[in-house]
Regions:
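Charged, solvent-exposed helices and adjacent loops that form client-binding or oligomerization surfaces
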Residues: 149-173
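An acidic, gly/pro-interrupted, aromatic-rich
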Residues: 1-125, 162, 172-203
């Protein structure tokens, strides 16, 4: 379900707020949606601090301009009561989880968590990432695929330091001792993990 897809990524990233109750919050969403819908009379002001990372249950909803990532994952419009949600599987959903500002930030934070909690060696960090996200013993084939992905991305960002700066370091702080290139590569790894069928469909 829409809220659970976001909440799971939020939880795995380590950013999720455990705060309960209180008013609705305004997590990141694509810019200018409200300005276009309301002729510039209203705007979506992204919440700051802990409220930015509260569960989807607390997200402000407006029927005329629903929160886009939830709408993409079949959240009901609230115009009528919904007994059962109809689930779909569309390419647009993958665009959200790969490119939406919030999901990219979740991937960045998950990368930081992998780096700081996973050990000192790359192989240990990748094993930690698999155990954390899939919640089962690490399979050799998955580890090999993830290692190949990491090495390829690391080589890419070593040749393109400006691209590494674009991907990591603006929202989530750089861990002590880490390089931007390494964290950018880990962010791609984290993004891929958050988009696995085992995470989105079976998690």
């Amino acid at each position: 379900e829409a809220e659970m897809v976001r909440d799971q990524a939020l939880s795995l990233s380590g950013l999720q707020s455990v705060k309960m109750h209180g008013p609705s919050v305004y997590p990141p969403q694509p810019p200018n949606l409200w300005q276009a819908a309301f002729n510039g009379q209203r705007s979506w002001v992204t919440s700051k601090g802990e409220d930015r990372y509260r569960r989807g249950f607390y997200t402000f909803l407006r029927r005329t301009v629903p929160y886009p990532s939830m709408a993409t994952f079949d959240a009901p419009s609230r115009e009528i009561c919904t007994v059962r949600r109809i689930r779909t599987n569309t390419p647009l959903q993958s665009f959200v989880t790969l490119n939406d500002e919030a999901y990219v930030e979740f991937a960045q934070a998950l990368a930081r968590r992998i780096y700081t909690e996973g050990g000192n060696l790359t192989v240990d960090r990748l094993k930690f990432a698999l155990r954390l996200t899939l919640a089962k013993p690490v399979e050799a084939r998955r580890l090999a695929a993830l290692t190949e992905l990491f090495n390829g991305e690391l080589a890419y960002y070593q040749e393109r330091p400006d691209a590494a700066k674009e991907l990591f370091g603006k929202t989530v702080p750089l861990p002590p001792g880490a390089s931007l290139r390494e964290m950018a590569a880990l962010t791609v790894v984290a993004n891929v993990l958050l988009n696995l069928d085992a995470i989105l469909m079976k998690g």
